[in-house]
Amino acid sequence: MFSVEFVSLFTEICSGGSVWGTSGQRILSEFSLDPFTKMELIRDGVLVFGRDFRNLLSFPSRAEVLRAIQRHYEAIRKYGASDAGWLLDTARCLYTLKTNQIAAKTAAGEWALEHHLCPNPEVMEKALEIRRNPEKLLKDESVTAWLKTITPQIQEFADVLENALQKEMHSGSEI
């Protein structure tokens, strides 16, 4: 994925940007610099023009990261249906929760499989296959029919994230 962000150093509000991903291009007029974006900018941002300001950004606290994961978890519970991307989003949340790092969706899905976190590994494997070749596979009627059936598996994987978040909260971390 490639994204462009224009950041106000005083408010940490992005005044605009473009995001390119497998679902296409989106142009945003404004969005907040959330903990995930801050982590990516600080660790992996590439300056294209102007003065590098990453040293002026504060790395998100563990509590901020946990709150961001919690918000994403709530979105998965509310909207997570019939789209393999929700499985990969869940894997990214788990990866960040366990490592305090950010990973690409594909890498996070592979990591979740390697660490035996997926209650339905065959579903994650199919999600990764779609992620690697979306133009071909999303035109396949059998794939689109399959996607309509995976809501229970998305929510079951969200259970894994819920349990990991609860375990983190009980270990003394604040959300």
Residue spans for each PLM region:
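Short glycine-rich, low-complexity/disordered patches
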Residues: 2-3, 86, 174-175
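Hydrophobic alpha-helical packing segments in soluble, helical-rich domains
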Residues: 74-106
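Conserved NTP/Mg2+-binding pocket subregion across the NTase superfamily
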Residues: 1-81, 159
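Structured mid-to-C-terminal alpha-helical surface segments
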Residues: 101, 105-175
